Amino acid sequence: MNKIIKLIFVLCCFCGIAQAQPQRPKLVVGIVIDQMRWDYLYRYYARYGEGGFKRMLGEGFCVENCKIPYIPSVTAIGHSSIWTGSVPSIHGIAGNNFVKDGKVVNCTADDTVNPVGSDSKAGKMSPRNLWVTTIGDELRLATNNRSKVIGVALKDRASILPAGHHANGAFWFDDKSGKFITSTFYMDKLPEWVNKFNKQKFPNKYLSQKWETLYPIDSYKESTSDDTNYENGIVEGEKAVLPLDLPTLYKKHGYKILRNTPFGCNLTFDIAKAAIEGENLGRNTDTDLLTISCSSTDYIGHQVGVNAIETEDCYLRLDKALADFFAYLDQTVGKGNYLTFLTADHGGVNNATFLQDQRIPAGIWNKKGLVDELNKNLKTKFNTNKDLVKTIMNYQVFFNTDIIEELGLDYAAIKQAVVDRLKKDKDVHYAFDMEKTSIESIPEELKFRAINGYNRERSGGVQIVPKPGHYDYYSSKGTTHGAWNPYDIHIPCLFMGWGIQHGESAQPHYMTDIAATVCAMLHIQAPNGCIGTPIF
């Protein structure tokens, strides 16, 4: 009898241990739609199908009031902040480009690595400029590297930064070869599944057709007409009118034209499926992670703006691509076995001319010649023949601090002189010394975003905040992003699948809460720079 009791006790202990193991999904899929404004969920809602955005809204949990907690609101920072739960001040990615060691650098450029799959410089990329861990890094650490982490996107930074340092691979599109490539940071040769995918020449198939509207063009009621002075051509020098003869454009411009069509999103989901099959994602003992970024929405948005038929058609096609991808996940991983979230890295402002035509205050902030003007004024004021201002980007003024230090000049006084000049600009709302942000007489909504966005080593010394509806852009047509305003920082945030109950919340949340939420659901440590709070 005693032996039986002992046996039962031991079995109960083992059962307790088994039950104590945290429940996790087989696969986590994070989808970032580049430049997707929150209102796109509803602007085109009536024409969405049941399996894409509507499925996420109907089955999942929608965070209606999710915003970006920093400036500038640009792609590299957005992707970094989503997947790290952090901000530029901490994670180090201060822009798509920023100043590092006195030089302007691309956020993922790395001369210490070589391209894999191409001889293009597009392969000399890595996440080394990212100072913190990502969700995927922490997942790999938590499972003793048993979990697999893969990142895919057309843009290098949109694949590399989400996947993180410890990923099994990150793959991005090379315009020169029309193939997906990687770098020696991850591996010395492409996996066989990537080679197999590249040999299928999906880009050629997509570029062998016309881009025609999905529905009759006169039924696109959420957009302006198809030929307006608000739009650049989908490719510079081409007219912004559908249909587009892609075979002809391909002959003139090469593979890069694919980025500026909705079919770039289709190609991204194609390689996402290939990654799932090639790496057996979602079929392992431990949770795997796939990061996906749809970059074409950003390329199209920049060229034609928020109100274009091309933008509307892109999202209607994206909705179908999402529906197809979710159906694929249901079949391969199993409905209820995967957790997915969808969000954006930033939004986009309405074209200034369009707003002016609606009698809404707007304009292009013209900084042409401003660097030269500032340097001329500073040379006179501080009695030097050296240029003290390096450049203006990310709505920040960057200074030649090494020269200022060498000459023994008062850096604070130099910055104040620049601030005084900028405040005279009719399109500038605020200008301030980044090191004095906390004591500036500006709204808290701006103050905390400027502080979060300021990286002492990589940001400029003076912050510029244009008036609402005003922005810095090379063209009066199309659109851009980067500001603190709702059109740039209010983003969609949807969760669906494993562990998610249907619902919605209008409570304030931030982009940085996404990583905290996913890690809490997986019962793993949050990324080491995470400042977010779990949403549920």
Segments from the language model and where they lie:
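Bacterial Sec-dependent N-terminal signal peptides
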Residues: 1-24
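Secreted, luminal/periplasmic, and some membrane-associated catalytic domains
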Residues: 48, 65, 74, 96-124, ...
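Short, structured active-site-proximal loop/turn typified by the sulfatase FGly-forming signature C/S-X-P-X-R
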Residues: 41-90, 148-152
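Short, solvent-exposed turn/loop segments enriched in Gly/Ser/Thr/Pro and often Arg
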Residues: 63-83, 151-161, 293-295, 339, ...
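Substrate-binding rim/cap in mid-to-C-terminal beta-strand-loop elements of soluble/periplasmic
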Residues: 369-409, 480-522
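Second-shell loop/turn segments in exported
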Residues: 37-43, 68, 121-127, 255-262, ...
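Beta-strand elements within well-structured catalytic alpha/beta cores of enzymes
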Residues: 25-37, 56, 82, 139, ...
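His/Asp/Glu-rich, glycine-adjacent segments
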Residues: 87, 95-286, 295-302, 423-426
